[in-house]
Amino acid sequence: MEKVLCKDIMKGETYWELYRCTERMNFDSTEKLKKKNKEVIKYLSKLKDSGRSEEAIMLFKKDQIAWKNYVVHRCAYKGHSYDKDSYVYFSNKDLCEAVENYRRIESLDGELNIP
């Protein structure tokens, strides 16, 4: 049975449900991305070419840093019109980061035949 991430909190009664759900989505996507990053590094560490493994891991880590920078700026841009102290701002930020994390996971799934 497939687990629905926010089923237990989404009753359709308050905005708080939405805020909690986006927070949960961000946490879930962050944990899944951390796991995927570990899988990628493990895969890259097994490359047979001497010295290529370390270079590949270093380049992947740099790519990940650049991607995180993209997410920070992308989500700041998408939420620039909201009051920075509002729940709407934080919910929008959480949702944006979660979406980008899930996209990154999909992207990594398709690279280098990484399982």
Predicted regions and their residues:
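N-terminal alpha-helical modules
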Residues: M1-P115
